[in-house]
Curated annotation (Swiss-Prot):
One of its GO terms (cellular component) is cytoplasm. GO terms for molecular function: translation release factor activity, codon specific. Peptide chain release factor 1 directs the termination of translation in response to the peptide chain termination codons UAG and UAA. Residues 292-326 are annotated as: Disordered. It comes from Synechococcus sp. (strain RCC307). Its main location: cytoplasm. Pfam families: PCRF, RF-1. PROSITE patterns: RF_PROK_I (PS00745). Methylated by PrmC. Methylation increases the termination efficiency of RF1. This is Peptide chain release factor 1. PANTHER family: LD18447P (PTHR43804), PEPTIDE CHAIN RELEASE FACTOR APG3, CHLOROPLASTIC (PTHR43804:SF8). Residues 306-326 have a biased composition (Basic and acidic residues).
Length: 364
């Protein structure tokens, strides 16, 4: 990215910050609590960026002084070595700050702070694909535990030999979507299934969709568009299983989206969960349609969330997980144990770099 473009954006941010400072000092603003809170929040959001930019300017001045010292220290080996070391340290800090400032200039995604509905569907591979879907579910549950997130299954279709034909997990916590959005797509596994007697390696797939939770204000649903029915559902056990219809089957007629929810103990709770899933699915559908109208280059980026894209292969024989978007390998056991931080960080970095290039191109 052109440094002059970055500097112009940072100078504009500083001007905005200074204007906010003046507004906050205005007595008429102090008398309006709502406006005061809005301006104070915006000031707090911009302050780290402004402080980093001021530090970068200070580093530039210190770098020039160190260069001058280096010129003047010719013939004095000890002083020259000190000047070289200082230049190295200053250059390293400048590089880190430059990168941080570039990323900070990217438009924020308002969905990043949201919790998610994570849907896993068994794909090609029959029973083995269902088992693989179960393995992926455990991987995400372990990662969520590491992050301190809450995980609740809200809809599940279990397979006869284990695993799931389909599973939807509600994962709630801070900035869940910002991390898990990179998991959307086709996950392929290459391994010898437990049901394979000849020891042959099979290839199976499961599809992951990551949908930010949608508030009722985000998605308007006309009750006339819903077809809701109930069914008997397994649950707490005993006579309740056979006599009480707690499962909810919800159909959104305009889109054909169907949600079957059985995990809660009451029909009312299952209906609420089904509506949560439907809102998330409708919001995801709107976003997919909007993305389809964008350029092919934009849709191909790391964080596109295209559920038909093969994003990763898990090779048991070689103990290797390959992320095809990054062209990088990661230890299989580490990934399956839910230690996804390195992988997610690499995806985030690649996504940010691509967006920076797009931002610079759009401004040129």
């Amino acid at each position: 990215m052109d440094q002059s473009f970055v500097t112009e954006r940072l100078e504009a941010t500083c001007r905005t910050f200074n204007a906010l400072e003046r507004q906050l000092a205005d007595p008429s603003v102090a008398a309006d609590p709502e406006q005061l809170l809005t301006l104070a929040k915006e000031r707090s959001r911009l302050e780290p960026l402004v402080l980093d930019y001021q530090r970068l300017q200070q580093l530039h001045a210190e770098h020039q002084q160190a260069q001058q010292l280096l010129k003047e220290s010719k013939g004095d080996a000890e002083l020259e070595a000190l000047a070289q070391e200082e230049l190295q340290q200053l250059s390293s800090e400048q590089e880190q700050l430059n990168q941080r400032l570039k990323v900070a200039l990217l438009p924020s995604d308002p969905r990043d702070e949201r919790s998610v509905m994570l849907e896993i569907r068994a794909g090609a591979g029959g029973d083995e694909a269902c088992l693989w879907a179960g393995d992926l579910a455990r991987m995400y549950e372990r990662h969520a535990q590491t992050c301190g997130w809450q995980v609740n299954p809200v809809s599940a279709s279990e397979a006869e030999l284990g695993g799931f034909k389909e599973l939807i997990l509600a994962i709630r916590g801070d900035a869940v979507f910002s991390q898990l959005k990179y998991e959307a797509g086709v996950h392929r596994v290459q391994r010898v299934p437990a049901t394979e007697s000849q020891g042959r390696v099979h290839t199976s797939t499961a599809t992951v969709a990551v949908m930010p939770e949608a508030d009722p204000v985000d998605v308007q649903i006309d009750p006339k568009d819903l077809d809701i029915s109930t069914a008997r559902s397994g649950g707490a056990g005993g006579q309740n299983v056979n006599k009480v219809e707690t499962a909810v089957d919800l159909l959104h007629k305009p889109t054909g989206i169907r949600v079957f929810c059985t995990q809660e103990r009451s029909q009312l709770q299952n209906r609420e969960r089904a509506m949560e899933i439907l809102r998330a699915k409708l919001l995801a559908k709107e976003e997919e349609e909007a993305a389809a109208a964008e350029s092919s280059a934009r849709r191909a980026q790391v964080g596109s969330g295209d559920r038909s894209e093969k994003i990763r292969t898990y090779n048991y024989k070689d103990n290797r997980t390959t992320d095809h978007r990054l062209g990088k390998n990661f230890p299989l056991e580490t990934v399956l144990n839910g230690q996804l931080s390195d992988l997610i960080e690499a995806c985030t970095h690649a996504d940010q770099q691509q967006k920076l290039e797009e931002l610079a191109a759009s401004e040129s």
